[in-house]
């Protein structure tokens, strides 16, 4: 199973019995569907305001028959500044232009 760097952001979604509604999704430009579920640490998500972008190590796995991004809850992560996010986004743009 291959882990790779993925930038995610938190948002408020539907509340379920399993969550407070604080969810995470991949940001655009990385080749993942924007509605793809991200399974990651609730403590990480709660540590910053809604809308924060995190750089995580994640892999694609199946959950309930659908692909999702999985990040082990004990993995390190980085809170991205706006400038760091722009740097990552420009790399995605460069690699998509090379295809």
Where is each model-derived feature located?
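Structural detector for short beta-strands of small beta-barrel domains
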Residues: 1-17
């Amino acid at each position: 199973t291959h882990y790779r760097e993925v930038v995610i952001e938190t948002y408020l979604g539907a509340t379920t019995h399993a969550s407070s509604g604080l969810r995470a999704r991949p940001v655009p430009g990385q080749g993942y569907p924007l509605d793809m579920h991200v399974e990651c640490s609730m403590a990480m998500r709660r540590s910053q305001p809604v809308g924060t972008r995190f750089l995580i190590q994640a892999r694609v796995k199946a959950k309930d028959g659908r692909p999702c991004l999985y990040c082990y809850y004990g993995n390190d992560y980085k809170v991205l500044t706006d400038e760091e996010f722009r740097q990552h986004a420009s790399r995605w743009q460069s690699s998509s232009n090379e295809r």
